[in-house]
Amino acid sequence: MLDIKLIRENPEIVKRDLIKRGETEKLKWIDEILELDKKWRENLKKINQLRKERNQLAVQIGKRKKAGEPIDDLLKRSNEIVKQIEELEKENEELKKKIDYYLWRLPNITHESVPVGESDEDNVPIRFWGKAKVWEGFLETFKEQSLGKMEYEVLSWRPRLHVDMLELLRGADLERAAKVSGARFYYLLNELVILDLALIRFALDKLIEKGFTPVIPPYMVRRFVEEGATTFDDFEDVIYKVEGEDLYLIPTAEHPLAGMHANEILDGKDLPLLYVGVSPCFRKEAGTAGKDTKGIFRVHQFHKVEQFVYSRPEESWEWHERIIANAEEIFQALEIPYRVVNICTGDLGYVAAKKYDIEAWMAGQGKFREVVSASNCTDWQARRLNIRFRDKTHEKPRFVHTLNSTAIATSRAIVAILENHQTEEGVVKLPKALWKYTGFKEILPAHMKEKCCQD
């Protein structure tokens, strides 16, 4: 939510930002807010004047009573003032509702470094890491997507898609999951169960070492938390509701972590607060019909480890760089080639002022795919959830800044591992960083395991 003072004092800043975001239909909202706010402030001034007059009348009434003089005219005026105040306060309540309607639906103000664009095609790659395995048929596409800035090894054989690897390894049962739950669900099986849990523990250990407090949050939250953490559109497109209850299944641990300190004034000396949440995530994926319908890349349920930071406003941009760096460390340890992209205004969403994505090279698909999002939400969530801090007891509280980043979403990390670490024979060679967590160094195709057992 935006600060009404920003709109009141610098409406052109907000309008320019809406134009950059392509939200031109909301430009008239700013003029409407200014008009409503002007009327609200005029009414408030009248209310304060009337209260002052009423207090003066109370003094006069006291004096007249003491002197035994009539007070009927003063009482009549006092009662008129009470009614006038009630009417003005009622009018201001309605004005406030209208103002809040707009404020709650306006996007965050973007950082000056966010590129202007219309869609994900306008996102800007800013750095690359790793040596990609590239099938010769994907080479030209890879060079274009990596801007010629990434090392690569050309393969004469085409790596399998992760969905084919799942079948080869007997790592998942998608058909039975569809029978039981519908599309975009899966049974994870055998070594991939261990791999999923290993990825969670690996990411968790990395962040605990960096001072993050581990948290398993509630998997369901009340509506005010979701309204505070995200946009209203998500209630239709993303979030599952528990029927008959004021509860919603979380689409990410970010949301219960954002709500953790709702309506609190934090002690400034405790900032930054660093949390690493571990949870399942539940998503409708209503707006993604036809996309990634096979496999486990885009699903209704998955595990995720999430970084969440409450910081001072003046420190939040430094923390944004830190949390994306943390995520990069994790994918470097997993030996997954990737690029970091600066998300453009048209793909940014309403909540973040700036967002980085890590896109892993998927050797089977021949393209980069999103595996991490890291956002600085500045005070947009904090205003909605009323999360403030102060350094001294009598100091006026200020809103914190909130930041979040994926550490690892296990299903997508598994996709990246299966596509990048497979051999021509279909063996998956796990990165060394995971060995102590899995207890094994490779995953064999099912037919190889059967042959080993027979021998």
Curated annotation (Swiss-Prot):
L-serine binds at residues 252-254, 306, 406. The gene is serS. Its main location: cytoplasm. The lineage of its organism: Archaea, Methanobacteriati, Methanobacteriota, Thermococci, Thermococcales. Its EC number is 6.1.1.11. It is an enzyme of class 6 (ligase). Belongs to the class-II aminoacyl-tRNA synthetase family. Type-1 seryl-tRNA synthetase subfamily. It holds the Pfam family tRNA-synt_2b. One of its GO terms (biological process) is selenocysteine biosynthetic process. This is Serine--tRNA ligase. Catalyzes the attachment of serine to tRNA(Ser). Is also able to aminoacylate tRNA(Sec) with serine, to form the misacylated tRNA L-seryl-tRNA(Sec), which will be further converted into selenocysteinyl-tRNA(Sec). Transmembrane segments: none annotated. ATP binds at residues 283-285, 299, 370-373. One of its GO terms (molecular function) is ATP binding. Pathway: Aminoacyl-tRNA biosynthesis; selenocysteinyl-tRNA(Sec) biosynthesis; L-seryl-tRNA(Sec) from L-serine and tRNA(Sec): step 1/1. InterPro entries: aa-tRNA-synt_IIb, aa-tRNA-synth_II, aa-tRNA-synth_II/BPL/LPL, Ser-tRNA-ligase_type_1, Ser-tRNA-synth_1_N, SerRS_1_N_sf, SerRS_core, tRNA-bd_arm. Homodimer. The tRNA molecule binds across the dimer. PANTHER family: SERYL-TRNA SYNTHETASE. GO terms for cellular component: cytosol.
